[in-house]
Design a protein with these regions (language model features):
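Two-component/phosphorelay signaling modules centered on CheY-like receiver
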Residues: 14-32
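Conserved acidic carboxylate
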Residues: 11
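Hydrophobic/aromatic residues positioned on beta-strands within the core alpha/beta folds
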Residues: 84-86
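Acidic catalytic/metal-coordinating carboxylates
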Residues: 36-39, 62-68
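The feature encodes the CheY-like receiver
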Residues: 59, 68, 77, 89
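Non-catalytic signal-transmission and effector/linker regions of two-component phosphorelay proteins
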Residues: 1-8, 113-131
Length: 131
C-alpha cells in the first residue's frame, strides 16, 4: 500500500487549521501545518508536500508572497497550490494582471464548501495517469 499524500495547510487561524487538518486527515491524507508564509516555505522546502492549501492574509509573510516564492523555486514550482481565503476575488484579479505568475490550481472562499474542496483536492492528487 502506498504512503498517504501529504497536504501542507498554511493558515494563521487556529480554527481553520483544525477544520482543514481534520477534514483532510479523515479522508486519508497526511497533514502538516504552518501558521505563516515564512514557516510555510520552510516546511514546504523540508517536507515536500504533495499539495499546499494557502491563506492570503497572514502575519510575517503573506500568502501572496509565499505563492510567488514557491513559484520561483524550481523544486517547489510544481506543487499544486489551493488558495482558501476570504479575499478570493481580489487575489484572482491580482494574479490575472501578473503574467509572470501562474495562477494557483484552485481558489475557494472561506469557509470552503467541504464537498467541493475535497473533490478538487482528490482530483489534484490523483496519479497523473488517472487524470
Amino acid at each position: 500500500m502506498s504512503e498517504p499524500k501529504t497536504i501542507l495547510v498554511v493558515e494563521d487561524e487556529p480554527d481553520e487549521v483544525a477544520y482543514l487538518s481534520t477534514l483532510f486527515a479523515d479522508n486519508g491524507y497526511h497533514v502538516i501545518s504552518a501558521s505563516n508564509g515564512q514557516e510555510g516555505f520552510e516546511k514546504a522546502k523540508a517536507q515536500r508536500p504533495d499539495l499546499i492549501t494557502l491563506d492570503i492574509s497572514m502575519p510575517e509573510e503573506s500568502g501572496v508572497r509565499l505563492f510567488r516564492d514557491l513559484q520561483a523555486d524550481p523544486a517547489m514550482a510544481g506543487i499544486p497550490v489551493v488558495m482558501i481565503t476570504g479575499v478570493t476575488h481580489e487575489f484572482k484579479r491580482f494574479i490575472e494582471t501578473r503574467r509572470q505568475v501562474h495562477p494557483p490550481a484552485a481558489y475557494f472562499d472561506k469557509p470552503p464548501d467541504r464537498d467541493q474542496l475535497l473533490a478538487k483536492i482528490n482530483e489534484l492528487l490523483k496519479p497523473v495517469a488517472a487524470r
